[in-house]
């Protein structure tokens, strides 16, 4: 199998359940990072297709709920686990080792619940408006932008020693990966939203990435929870911004 195809399948297998997980070396995992936007395209396509075929047509509220459900199933809810964990750790105002203890605790607290409610609520509202407007292409663009933003976040933070996944993602976020992520995200937005909406979305996603990078540098490390929160936050931003544009 060609190396590039192995890395592409590795990225899709890691970020979705639609491709079987693959055995990989540390170098392979790092090389797969530049294929994260492709994994976003796979997620977006899987979420878009049922509705393009007419699932629950003329019932936008039901379509929006089904969209959230399908998105969760396709991604195994991987990114939302990061939202809950990071909300608990950040919301507690803890720093240092205590921050990481809370972040790695599998139990969910009040801040985690609030983070999930806000995140799911935003995703549902944004999707509902998208279904009303009929601009289903945004459903494809959102996951591409989210995973591209994750790559850029990894490029802004020193790898640290807190997490193997964080270290490998940071190692893979080289200039090529950044260029691919930025180009794919920009094209996805320009093809599905007005120019002003594209600018607004990029600005808000940039603020999310910057805030997460600042927190990661403050706490001297980054892990998969940061990545998941970045993906979920930027994906939701695309839906909400497009619904108002």
Swiss-Prot record:
**Pathway info:** Cofactor biosynthesis; adenosylcobalamin biosynthesis; adenosylcobalamin from cob(II)yrinate a,c-diamide: step 7/7
Q: Which segment of the chain is annotated as a signal peptide?
A: none
Carries keyword Acetylation?
no
An example of a GO molecular function for this protein is: adenosylcobinamide-GDP ribazoletransferase activity
What Pfam family is a match, any one? CobS
Enumerate the UniProt keywords alphabetically.
Cell inner membrane, Cell membrane, Cobalamin biosynthesis, Magnesium, Membrane, Transferase, Transmembrane, Transmembrane helix
Q: Provide the E.C. number(s) assigned to this enzyme.
A: 2.7.8.26
Q: Which residues cross the membrane?
A: 35-55, 108-128, 137-157, 176-196, 197-217
Cofactor requirements of the protein? Mg(2+)
Localization terms from the record = Cell inner membrane
This entry carries the following GO cellular component terms, namely: plasma membrane
Q: Describe the task this protein carries out.
A: Joins adenosylcobinamide-GDP and alpha-ribazole to generate adenosylcobalamin (Ado-cobalamin). Also synthesizes adenosylcobalamin 5'-phosphate from adenosylcobinamide-GDP and alpha-ribazole 5'-phosphate.
Q: Tell me its family.
A: Belongs to the CobS family.
Q: What is this protein called?
A: Adenosylcobinamide-GDP ribazoletransferase
Species for this entry: Nitratidesulfovibrio vulgaris (strain ATCC 29579 / DSM 644 / CCUG 34227 / NCIMB 8303 / VKM B-1760 / Hildenborough)
């Amino acid at each position: 199998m060609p190396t590039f195809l192995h890395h592409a399948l590795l990225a899709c297998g890691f970020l979705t359940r639609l491709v079987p997980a693959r055995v990989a070396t540390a170098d392979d995992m790092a090389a797969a990072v530049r294929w994260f936007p492709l994994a976003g395209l796979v997620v977006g396509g899987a979420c878009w297709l049922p509705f393009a075929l007419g699932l629950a047509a003329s019932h936008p509220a039901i379509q929006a709920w089904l969209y959230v459900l399908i998105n969760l199933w396709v991604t195994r809810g991987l990114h939302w686990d990061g939202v809950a964990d990071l909300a608990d750790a950040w919301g507690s105002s803890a720093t240092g080792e205590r921050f990481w203890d809370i972040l790695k605790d599998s139990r969910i607290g009040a801040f985690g619940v609030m983070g999930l409610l806000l995140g799911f609520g935003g995703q549902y509202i944004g999707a509902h408006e998208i279904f009303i407007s009929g601009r289903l292409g945004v459903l494809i663009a959102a996951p591409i932008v989210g995973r591209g933003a994750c790559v850029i976040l990894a490029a802004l933070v020193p790898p640290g020693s807190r997490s193997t996944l964080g270290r490998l993602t940071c190692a893979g976020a080289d200039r090529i990966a950044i260029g691919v992520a930025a180009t794919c995200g920009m094209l996805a937005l320009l093809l599905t939203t007005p120019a002003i909406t594209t600018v607004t979305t990029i600005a808000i996603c940039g603020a999310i990435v910057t805030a997460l990078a600042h927190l990661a540098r403050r706490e001297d490390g980054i892990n998969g929870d940061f990545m998941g929160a970045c993906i979920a936050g930027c994906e939701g931003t695309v839906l909400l911004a497009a619904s108002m544009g």
